[in-house]
């Protein structure tokens, strides 16, 4: 499964890439990722968080609502119920988050022990 991932480059700018969450299909193995903890994060529509970097690498699974993530170079990605993505922009200029729509945005936020690497082929 391919996941959108927000990472940081050498200049501190955050950019989106794609990370493969599984080992190659012929291996028949799932890729394990150690986690520190998980939590449920809930916000009302219209919530806005200005640019800041992630404190730790995190995986997000949207359970309800809609949110927009903006990287430091202005690229925006939109996520809604059923979407899973990674915020791995440790340090640097960070990202902004905005929730929109009519329903509460509920997200399963999983803090990982290390950054998930392995860019997927397009």
What is each model feature region?
Residues 48-49, 65-70, 84, 114-116:
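Short beta-strand segments in beta-sandwich/barrel cores
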Residues 16, 40, 59, 84-86, ...:
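Conserved hydrophobic/aromatic beta-strand scaffold that supports enzyme active sites
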Residues 74-83, 89-116:
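Ligand-binding loop in jelly-roll beta-barrel domains
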Residues 1-41:
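A short, N-terminal "cap"/entry segment at the start of jelly-roll beta-barrel domains
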Residues 21-24, 34-54, 77, 88-92, ...:
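Conserved short histidine dyad/triad with adjacent acidic residue
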Residues 53, 59-81:
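A short beta-strand-loop-beta hairpin characteristic of the jelly-roll/cupin
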């Amino acid at each position: 499964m391919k996941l959108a991932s927000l990472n940081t480059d050498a200049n501190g700018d955050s950019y989106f890439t794609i990370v493969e969450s599984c080992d190659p299909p012929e291996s028949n193995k799932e890729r394990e990722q150690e986690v520190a903890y998980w939590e449920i994060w809930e916000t009302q529509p219209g919530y806005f968080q200005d640019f800041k970097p992630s404190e730790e690498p995190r995986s997000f699974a949207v359970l309800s609502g809609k949110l927009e993530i903006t990287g430091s170079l202005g690229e925006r990605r939109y996520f809604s119920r059923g979407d899973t993505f990674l915020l791995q922009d440790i340090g640097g200029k960070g990202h902004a988050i905005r929730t929109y729509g009519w329903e509460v945005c509920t997200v399963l936020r999983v803090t990982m022990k290390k950054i998930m690497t392995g860019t997927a082929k397009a």
